């Protein structure tokens, strides 16, 4: 069997853009959803909007996703422009649910699929990506099979080009500032208000809200349990607090979530390889290491250097907490940050680095120059 072994720009062609959002506390759910997506869909460019997920997670999973023709992008929502301190009346949903507002800030593709992390994909989503949005801003399935209000925002096929040209991000932020205390379902309510007359309704199979089982039983919506589950819907969404990863839950298809949670990435990659889909991943290897000790957020041209020199690894240390300007650098795989470090650890780091970069404009820490001379850096 002939395998596709492409590198560089060719690996980046014809990818379907998919976005997840969450924090490190939800990492198992994010990865489970990602594994289910990649088990049935190759050539996906996955963006993960986050504030605190470690680089190592991205570095390892990126290799697997690249092997099936995709890519994994670390999108750090760090800074005042990404503040999401709005109130939310649903205790099982945290502030990162509002992160989807910022999709246009990070995603380059014209069409993008947003997926909540409390779901699993059970099949090929090509037909979903091929949905014609027409003049609509997004496509979404009805909430709770029609028993809820409007659409469920856990699966959104978004016209990202239209969102960018109409500054939807800012419209959502302003509407949330105004209404967040008056709505019952957080950002889902806000999205429904803004797009109530400009969304395309998806078939339930693309957002089958199996997590509504408990609510349907409580409200005596018997019709929900008559909907066929064979074949499985394309996306199973475990809405509500009745989650399958908890010790106990009452909803159906709990086992489907666990199947993907325990599924090995090596199995996913080998399954695609058997179908003739395999790409050589871009394995990161630093050719040179450099170190900087800073006592200020201002490290001259560091963003530019990091982007222009991807084969050089930058170690940036500080004796204090780091500012947002520096923490944002953690999205690059060729940067390692050491906030709140100690002099003896700084010395060890400098000793193991190839060169020292003196990029600080002010508040220089003089003792480091003695170390530079000592170790001939």
Q: What are the residue ranges of the model-derived segments?
A:
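Active-site-proximal specificity loops/subdomain of glycosyltransferases
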Residues: 63-105
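Acidic donor-binding loop of glycosyltransferase active sites
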Residues: 351-364
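Nucleotide-activated donor-binding/catalytic signature segment of Leloir-type glycosyltransferases, i.e.
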Residues: 324-340
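A glycosyltransferase accessory/donor-loop signature
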Residues: 2-16, 20-25, 32, 41, ...
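Conserved donor-nucleotide/metal-binding helix-loop-beta segment in metal-dependent transferases, i.e.
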Residues: 121-148
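Conserved active-site histidine-acidic residue motif and adjacent donor-binding/catalytic loop
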Residues: 319-320, 336-349
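Conserved catalytic-core segment of nucleotide-activated headgroup transferases in glycan assembly
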Residues: 48, 282-328
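Short aromatic/hydrophobic "clamp" motif used to bind/position activated sugar donors
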Residues: 112
């Amino acid at each position: 069997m002939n395998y596709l072994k492409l590198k560089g720009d060719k690996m980046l062609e014809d990818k379907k853009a998919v976005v997840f959002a969450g924090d490190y506390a939800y990492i198992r759910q994010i990865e489970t959803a990602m594994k289910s997506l990649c088990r049935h869909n190759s050539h996906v460019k996955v963006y993960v909007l986050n504030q605190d997920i470690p680089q190592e997670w991205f570095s390892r999973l990126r290799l697997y996703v690249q092997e099936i023709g995709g890519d994994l992008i670390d999108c750090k929502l760090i800074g005042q422009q990404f503040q999401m301190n709005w109130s939310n009346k649903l205790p099982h949903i945290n502030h990162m649910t509002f992160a989807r507002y910022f999709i246009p800030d990070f995603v380059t593709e014209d069409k993008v699929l947003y997926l909540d992390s409390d779901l699993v994909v059970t099949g090929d989503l090509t037909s979903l990506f091929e949905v014609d949005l027409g003049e609509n801003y997004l496509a979404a399935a009805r909430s709770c099979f029609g028993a809820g209000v409007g659409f469920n925002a856990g699966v959104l096929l978004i016209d990202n080009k239209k969102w960018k040209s109409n500054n939807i991000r800012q419209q959502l932020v302003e509407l949330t500032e105004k209404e967040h205390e008056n709505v019952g379902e957080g950002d889902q309510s806000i999205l429904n208000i803004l797009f109530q007359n400009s969304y395309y309704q998806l078939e339930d199979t693309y957002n089958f809200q199996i997590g509504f089982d408990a609510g349907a039983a409580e409200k005596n919506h018997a019709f929900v349990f008559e909907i066929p589950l064979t074949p499985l819907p394309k996306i199973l969404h475990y809405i509500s607090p009745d989650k399958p990863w908890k010790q106990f839950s009452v909803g159906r298809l709990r086992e489907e979530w666990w199947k993907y949670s325990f599924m090995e990435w090596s199995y996913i990659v080998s399954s695609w390889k058997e179908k003739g889909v395999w790409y050589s991943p871009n394995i990161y290897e630093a050719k040179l290491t450099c170190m900087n000790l800073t006592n200020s957020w201002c490290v001259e041209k560091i963003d530019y250097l990091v982007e222009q020199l991807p084969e050089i690894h930058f170690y940036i240390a500080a004796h204090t907490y780091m500012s947002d300007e520096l923490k944002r650098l953690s999205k690059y795989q060729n940067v390692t940050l050491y906030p709140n470090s100690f002099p003896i650890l700084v010395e060890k780091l400098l000793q193991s680095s190839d060169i020292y970069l003196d990029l600080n404009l002010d508040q220089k820490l003089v003792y480091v120059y003695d170390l530079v001379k000592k170790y001939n850096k």
